[in-house]
């Protein structure tokens, strides 16, 4: 905000997600409180724009927050601004920083170099969510000084059977794998078809699924035993059809 309060807001402007208009940076925190958040259908909610530190406190011991530094891969952002954004994160995470007392933060990083920048500045109280969707990615992180216990592996949009050797290596190191379906199964409009799509995602067995609709997974099988039973049923059906 204009008075240097960090708030939770997806965009640089408040137009899309609130009843107001303009850039976040043009308002003080108190001025932002005159607006309400709106849902994806533009329905006005009673909720206000929250401060980041209030959300961190609310989520302590029950939520893992994924901090995604968008300055790193945004076109037109200078190297100076990128470095400043990294240094800001480091300042907040180092002892005495506003985020340092929270141990439920995961940082999305886009390269070994970015992860190492945090690591070499002594950041040890977060997990790193990194893309590992090839054997080359695995080897790069395996050769880095960052222990695997600090790594969450983003394996892109879906489980790829051709990359099972990579997944096996990750699991052998105790690393969990995560897919993102916000641009695929989440986009299926028909509720029945979307539920079928979610079942397919579950049967593929990523460890974590990133979705915009977590509530729609309620009632779906999520335990390994239940998922394995679905896999076996699908295989039996396939064999029957072949006959």
What are these regions (language model features)?
Residues 129-243:
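C-terminal active-site rim and adjoining tail of enzyme catalytic domains
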Residues 5, 10-121, 125-129, 158, ...:
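Metal-dependent phosphodiesterase/phospholipase catalytic core, i.e.
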Residues 1-2:
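Asp-based phosphoryl-transfer active-site loop
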């Amino acid at each position: 905000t204009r008075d240097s309060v960090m708030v939770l807001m997806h965009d640089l402007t408040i137009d899309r997600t609130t009843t107001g208009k303009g850039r976040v940076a043009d308002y003080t925190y108190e001025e932002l409180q005159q607006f309400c958040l709106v849902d994806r259908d533009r329905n006005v909610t009673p909720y206000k724009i929250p401060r980041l530190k209030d959300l961190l406190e609310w989520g302590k011991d029950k939520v893992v927050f994924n901090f995604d530094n968008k300055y790193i891969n945004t076109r037109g952002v200078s190297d100076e601004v990128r470095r400043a954004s990294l240094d800001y994160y480091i300042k907040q995470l180092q002892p005495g920083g506003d985020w340092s007392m929270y141990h439920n933060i995961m940082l999305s990083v886009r390269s070994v170099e970015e992860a190492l920048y945090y690591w070499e500045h002594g950041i040890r109280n977060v997990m790193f969510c990194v893309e590992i969707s090839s054997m080359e990615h695995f080897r790069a992180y395996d050769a880095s000084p960052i222990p695997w216990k600090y790594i969450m592996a983003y394996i892109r949009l879906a489980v790829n059977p051709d990359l099972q050797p990579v997944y096996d290596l990750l699991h052998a190191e105790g690393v969990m794998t995560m897919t993102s379906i916000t641009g695929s199964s989440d986009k299926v409009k028909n509720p029945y078809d979307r539920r079928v799509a979610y079942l397919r995602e579950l049967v593929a067995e990523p460890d974590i699924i990133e979705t915009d609709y977590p509530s729609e997974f309620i009632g779906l099988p999520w335990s390994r035993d239940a998922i394995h039973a679905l896999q076996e049923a699908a295989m039996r059906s396939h064999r029957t059809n072949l006959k």
